[in-house]
């Protein structure tokens, strides 16, 4: 079994009888000598959908669970359910809107490549997005000529309702690359 310092985002763990999916990890290194590094992990309870937060020392042993990952493509919306199709055997995977509310902000019409469904023993657990997504700015203040030298930012809205900070020189219609885990602008898209 791995130690807390070996746990990565996207892994599933068994903690106090609960199945938890690691969503985020913050590493805190204390300044005192001899103090061990603390790992603050944010989880989503796979069964209930509740958010859970725990702290671990780097050498604590954590029980991990092996998950199956299937490559999928967004297919269609059926009422309040979103249907994703398996890329190999066309198995449909249904998610209620509440289950994937955060992920929907990064899913433009037509979907994006690199989406995976996490399953365990045939049970659908979660939807996992790639690290980056290319989206088009639909609403922002007009770009300022000559502003490329400054590091100032402004809010920009995407078609999905996502709002992030972008450099001042960008304007409506520009395609940008967004880093999904940090919800931040990376660069212009090709």
Swiss-Prot record:
Question: Which CDD domains is this protein grouped with?
Answer: S1_EF-P_repeat_1 (cd04470), S1_EF-P_repeat_2 (cd05794)
The record's family statement is: Belongs to the elongation factor P family.
State the species of origin. Answer: Erwinia tasmaniensis (strain DSM 17950 / CFBP 7177 / CIP 109463 / NCPPB 4357 / Et1/99)
Q: Which GO terms describe its cellular component?
A: cytoplasm
Q: SUPFAM superfamilies under this entry?
A: Nucleic acid-binding proteins, Translation proteins SH3-like domain
The Gene Ontology biological process terms listed for this entry are: peptide biosynthetic process
One of the entry's Gene Ontology molecular-function terms is: translation elongation factor activity
Q: What is this protein called?
A: Elongation factor P-like protein
What Pfam family is a match for this entry? Answer: Elong-fact-P_C
């Amino acid at each position: 079994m791995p130690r807390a310092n070996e746990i990565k985002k996207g892994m599933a763990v068994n903690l106090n009888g609960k199945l938890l999916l690691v969503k985020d990890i913050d590493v805190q290194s204390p300044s005192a000598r001899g103090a061990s590094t603390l790992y603050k992990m944010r989880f989503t309870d796979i069964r209930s959908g509740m958010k859970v937060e725990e702290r671990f020392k780097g050498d604590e042993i954590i029980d991990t669970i092996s998950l199956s990952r299937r490559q999928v493509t967004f297919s269609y919306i059926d009422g309040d359910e979103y249907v994703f199709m398996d890329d190999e055997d066309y198995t449909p995977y249904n998610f209620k809107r509440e289950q994937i509310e955060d992920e929907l902000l990064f899913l433009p019409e037509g979907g994006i490549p690199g989406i995976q469904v996490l399953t365990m023993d045939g049970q659908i657990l979660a939807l996992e997005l790639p690290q980056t997504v290319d989206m088009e700015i639909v609403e922002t203040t007009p770009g300022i000529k000559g502003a490329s030298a400054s590091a100032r930012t402004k809010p920009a809205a995407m078609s999905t309702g996502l709002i992030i900070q972008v450099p001042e020189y960008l304007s409506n219609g520009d395609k940008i690359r967004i880093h999904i885990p940090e919800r931040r602008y990376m660069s212009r898209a090709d």
